[in-house]
Amino acid sequence: MTDDKTTPARASAKLPRGFGDRGPAEIAATEKMLAAIRASYELYGFEAVETPFIEFTDALGKFLPDLDRPNEGVFSFKDDDESWLSLRYDLTAPLARFVAENFDKLPKPYRSYRAGYVFRNEKPGPGRFRQFMQFDADTVGAPSVAADAEMCMMAADTLERLGVKRGDYVIKVNNRKVLDGVLEAIGLGGEENAGRRMTVLRAIDKLDKFGPEGVALLLGPGRKDESGDFTKGAGLERTAVERVLNYVAAQGEGTAQMLGVLRASVAGSQRGEEGVAELAEIAALIDAAGFSARIRIDPSVVRGLEYYTGPVFEAELTFEVQGEDGKPVRFGSIGGGGRYDGLVGRFRGENVPATGFSIGVSRLYSALKAVGSPIVSAASQPGPVVVLVLDREHLARYQGFVTALRSADIRAELYLGGSGMNAQLKYADKRGSLCAVIQGSNERDHAEGARVTIRDLALGAELAGASKDRADYLELRAKAQFTVAEQNLVDAVREVMARRS
């Protein structure tokens, strides 16, 4: 007879491309970042709201199901009632649904912030993930571009609160209406050209990544990347490509001259001229508030999402870091936003003015590490005090030590593995513990009453490199390990912790 039983295949312990794990240090640093961003947003009068990870696909708006599944860009699946559901690809579209659903109950303007993970079903690459964290703030119900100017000011203040020095960043502002005026001038006006307009805008959005030559290919026939993948272009004629690139590269000495350059580029387009007028108003508000050195008009800013309808802005870090090829490169964008007056209106049949700003938390974490911000470079908190288990028949007694420490607001854990004393001490050291609590039969049966041994793990490590002077060595050893009465456990642990505070 033969045994038909087969060993099941072992599961592969690896992540899908574009996803990553985070350890305690990164989580702690991220929490500090979120706290700083939250404090800045709240200083400007925004309040928290939270929406779920999953929405109806049609509520997200931009991506709709085709015959088999929703278009690329989102992770989607069918519910048991045949409805398409999707993981959110940003935090703005879910906010629009929330505002529309609760419109009559919310104050207007409605000022809110929210943080969380978003998901993109896109090709991953270096620094490009399928799951990443954003932190948004939005004002809904404010038609004035003063709300857009405020977003830019808040973005600047938030970066400085996070430890980015003035001069190491710039908030760049443009207006989709100006871009629309340029596109009208090259024959891409009207609803029939909406798709090509978005292709052009997304091509311009890649200027920092691909440079003018790469953008020219995306505006024209298309571009093939290093892997051989081909991205279809907008199919513009050469003269139209040159006109778009000339607009994007437009420069001016100061705001007034830049506005003049933009007016000339949209001459004859009512929508384009309206956009330039809005930029002029934003510039005046920024100057009056004292932010003109930190915020500037830049025609290369487009933002890649379709729902923007007016001013758009981008937070860019201007310092250089080492690129993948070892050469210095500008760090680039870590957030952005803009006006989206039609997004809430999709649910209400009328436009509702809205504007917002989003920080890419995951990308910003890398940036703050690069500039040595104390928010992410500060040492992580020590591990818990570890109570060793030397005699399992006294487990309840050891648990009592842990409870006493926790009752005193001291992080503590009972060792729950099956190893001996030396391995337990190594475990405590790996956990980053400041000290370990030890009680064997010698301490428990002490003539003067039950005692515990406190081992200062950091001082213990220093003993190896201690002075050869015997008196100094003995003094250090006495501090590194000492015994106290059981009832003095908490005070003794606090003494050790105070040495490292």
Curated annotation (Swiss-Prot):
Signal peptide positions (record): none
EC top class named in words: ligase
Keyword Protein biosynthesis: yes
Pfam families xrefs: HGTP_anticodon, tRNA-synt_His
Location of this chain's protein in the cell: Cytoplasm
Coiled coil (UniProt feature): none
One CC-aspect GO term: cytoplasm
Entries under InterPro entries matching the protein: aa-tRNA-synth_II, aa-tRNA-synth_II/BPL/LPL, Anticodon-bd, Anticodon-bd_dom_sf, His-tRNA-ligase, HisRS-like_core, HisRS/HisZ
Reaction equations catalysed: tRNA(His) + L-histidine + ATP = L-histidyl-tRNA(His) + AMP + diphosphate + H(+)
One of the protein's GO biological processes: histidyl-tRNA aminoacylation
EC annotation from Swiss-Prot or TrEMBL: 6.1.1.21
Annotated keywords: Aminoacyl-tRNA synthetase, ATP-binding, Cytoplasm, Ligase, Nucleotide-binding, Protein biosynthesis
One annotated GO molecular function: ATP binding
Aminoacyl-tRNA synthetase in keyword set: yes
Family from the record: Belongs to the class-II aminoacyl-tRNA synthetase family.
Subunit structure: Homodimer.
The protein, known as: Histidine--tRNA ligase
Gene this protein is translated from: hisS
